[in-house]
């Protein structure tokens, strides 16, 4: 050990004292993640409020961690939850098992399932980390109606999937805001 070693150590301490603080005040000031960040899942809706999920279970089959459970149900004219023949009657994502890989997003044929930038999913109760359909559904925007209700944007499911963006503009979804993002992400 050299004579000047303590002085070198104090030099590091003194130089650090005059630098800008890099500490983040986490719960009070939340960092906005990058747009490509894989956060909490969200089940999206059509512009009239019907669900995009058709209960095909492709997301559950694509999940390598077996974290997704989907049970499909059949739509009727009296109770219609999605434009197709089926809808996701029971939908669950187990965040104790989810690894955030995004393979479920790629597998979804209707772009019903997307990932938001929400990263706070920690909880002290294991049961609360199994998110149900009600927890994952996108909130209703102005002009949307709570399902079940008849198809408002067309006569068949092709009107929803082929002419979707045109129908969204006619339904009054503001420019720059999509049904997937909602008003909070359109402002960024």
UniProtKB/Swiss-Prot annotation:
Q: What is its main location?
A: membrane
Cofactor-binding details, from the entry: Binds 2 [4Fe-4S] clusters per subunit.
Q: What GO CC terms are in its UniProt record?
A: plasma membrane
Q: Which superkingdom?
A: Bacteria
Q: Name one GO biological process term.
A: aerobic respiration
Q: Which cofactor does it need?
A: [4Fe-4S] cluster
Cell compartment(s), UniProt: Cell membrane
Annotated GO MF terms: 4 iron, 4 sulfur cluster binding; iron ion binding; NADH:ubiquinone reductase (non-electrogenic) activity; quinone binding
Name the HAMAP family for this protein: NDH1_NuoI
Domain 4Fe-4S ferredoxin-type residue range list = 43-73, 89-118
Binding of [4Fe-4S] cluster 1, residues? 53, 56, 59, 108
Q: Where does [4Fe-4S] cluster 2 bind?
A: 63, 98, 101, 104
Q: Mind listing the UniProt keywords for this protein, alphabetically?
A: 4Fe-4S, Cell membrane, Iron, Iron-sulfur, Membrane, Metal-binding, NAD, Quinone, Repeat, Translocase, Ubiquinone
- General function of this protein: NDH-1 shuttles electrons from NADH, via FMN and iron-sulfur (Fe-S) centers, to quinones in the respiratory chain. The immediate electron acceptor for the enzyme in this species is believed to be ubiquinone. Couples the redox reaction to proton translocation (for every two electrons transferred, four hydrogen ions are translocated across the cytoplasmic membrane), and thus conserves the redox energy in a proton gradient.
Query: Species name for this entry?
Result: Saccharopolyspora erythraea (strain ATCC 11635 / DSM 40517 / JCM 4748 / NBRC 13426 / NCIMB 8594 / NRRL 2338)
Q: State the oligomer form and interacting partners.
A: NDH-1 is composed of 14 different subunits. Subunits NuoA, H, J, K, L, M, N constitute the membrane sector of the complex.
Q: What is the protein named?
A: NADH-quinone oxidoreductase subunit I
Catalytic activity field? a quinone + NADH + 5 H(+)(in) = a quinol + NAD(+) + 4 H(+)(out)
The residue ranges flagged as biased composition, category Low complexity, are: 172-181
| Protein topology in the membrane | Peripheral membrane protein
- The keyword Phosphoprotein appears for this protein: no
Q: What class of enzyme is it?
A: translocase
InterPro entries given for it?
A: 4Fe4S_Fe-S-bd, 4Fe4S_Fe_S_CS, NADH_quinone_OxRdtase_chainI
């Amino acid at each position: 050990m050299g004579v000047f070693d303590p002085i070198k150590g104090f030099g590091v301490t003194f130089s650090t004292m005059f630098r800008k603080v890099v500490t983040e005040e986490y719960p009070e000031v939340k960092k906005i993640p990058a747009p490509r960040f894989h956060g909490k899942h969200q089940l999206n809706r059509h512009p009239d409020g019907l669900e995009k999920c058709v209960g095909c279970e492709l997301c559950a089959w694509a999940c390598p961690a077996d974290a997704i459970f989907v049970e499909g149900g059949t739509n009727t004219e009296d109770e219609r939850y999605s434009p197709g023949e089926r809808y996701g009657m029971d939908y669950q994502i187990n965040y104790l098992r989810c690894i955030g890989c995004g393979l479920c997003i790629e597998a979804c044929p209707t772009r019903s399932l997307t990932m938001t930038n929400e990263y706070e999913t920690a909880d002290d109760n294991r049961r609360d980390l199994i998110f149900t359909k009600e927890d994952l559904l996108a909130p209703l925007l102005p002009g949307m109606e709570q399902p079940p209700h008849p198809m408002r944007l067309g006569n068949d499911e092709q009107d929803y999937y082929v002419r979707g963006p045109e129908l969204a503009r006619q339904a009054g979804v503001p420019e720059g805001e999509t049904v997937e993002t909602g008003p909070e992400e359109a402002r960024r």
